[in-house]
Amino acid sequence: MALTSEQKKNVISRYKLHDNDTGSPEVQVAILTERINSLTEHLKLHKGDHHSRRGLLKMVGQRRALLNYLRDRHYERYRALIDKLGLRK
């Protein structure tokens, strides 16, 4: 469910805007997407895990808010990110 530090470093290296970038919206969305995908796989096996389902919904909402922020302020970066991540919209 949780990302290992190695997985997180890989995600950051793929989506960073500059060398020390760990907090840009692109990186945050990419990390959340990895966590969401991992948790989705967990929930396929453990259908009754409602606590994790609530966490998943919170993460999806947080990702949506970050994507809305990026869409409103930097539309080109937003389009590039959704294409790269393969998200709908």
UniProtKB/Swiss-Prot annotation:
<keyword id="KW-0699">rRNA-binding</keyword>
<comment type="subunit">
    <text>Part of the 30S ribosomal subunit. Forms a bridge to the 50S subunit in the 70S ribosome, contacting the 23S rRNA.</text>
</comment>
<dbReference type="InterPro" id="IPR009068">
    <property type="entry name" value="uS15_NS1_RNA-bd_sf"/>
</dbReference>
<dbReference type="Pfam" id="PF00312">
    <property type="entry name" value="Ribosomal_S15"/>
</dbReference>
<dbReference type="InterPro" id="IPR005290">
    <property type="entry name" value="Ribosomal_uS15_bac-type"/>
</dbReference>
<dbReference type="GO" id="GO:0006412">
    <property type="term" value="P:translation"/>
</dbReference>
<dbReference type="GO" id="GO:0003735">
    <property type="term" value="F:structural constituent of ribosome"/>
</dbReference>
<keyword id="KW-0687">Ribonucleoprotein</keyword>
<dbReference type="GO" id="GO:0019843">
    <property type="term" value="F:rRNA binding"/>
</dbReference>
<dbReference type="InterPro" id="IPR000589">
    <property type="entry name" value="Ribosomal_uS15"/>
</dbReference>
<protein>
    <recommendedName>
        <fullName>Small ribosomal subunit protein uS15</fullName>
    </recommendedName>
</protein>
<keyword id="KW-0689">Ribosomal protein</keyword>
<dbReference type="GO" id="GO:0022627">
    <property type="term" value="C:cytosolic small ribosomal subunit"/>
</dbReference>
<comment type="similarity">
    <text>Belongs to the universal ribosomal protein uS15 family.</text>
</comment>
<keyword id="KW-0694">RNA-binding</keyword>
<comment type="function">
    <text>Forms an intersubunit bridge (bridge B4) with the 23S rRNA of the 50S subunit in the ribosome.</text>
</comment>
<comment type="function">
    <text>One of the primary rRNA binding proteins, it binds directly to 16S rRNA where it helps nucleate assembly of the platform of the 30S subunit by binding and bridging several RNA helices of the 16S rRNA.</text>
</comment>
